[in-house]
Amino acid sequence: MEIRTIKIPEISKKAFEVFTSNRNVLRMHEYQLAVLKISDTIEDGDTQEQAQGSYSILKEMLGFIRAVLNLNDEDYDKLLDLENKRTQEIAEKLVGYMYGLTDEQLENATGETDPKD
């Protein structure tokens, strides 16, 4: 099991440990499968279905981040106050870590660097 760290200064001054344990890899796959399933069902849906899908995807993403980083209630509240784009960046980085990617590989894949790290 590899242990990585992720800095999220908006939540904590201390870096969070990210364990690439089977438990977290399972969480990552559950999150990805849920997002894919929701995306498939709302693709041709009406406005209400699309709004419900967006809501469900956000809830899945927040739950995934909270579980992997083991956030307490106070830190989770701080996560809720982040911009959606930043929350997506965190989730993408965690997914990359579960696949064994390095920070450099993640930066190359997105073509940008994260000024907060």
Over which residues does each language-model region extend?
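Short, intrinsically disordered N-terminal pre-domain segments
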Residues: 1-12
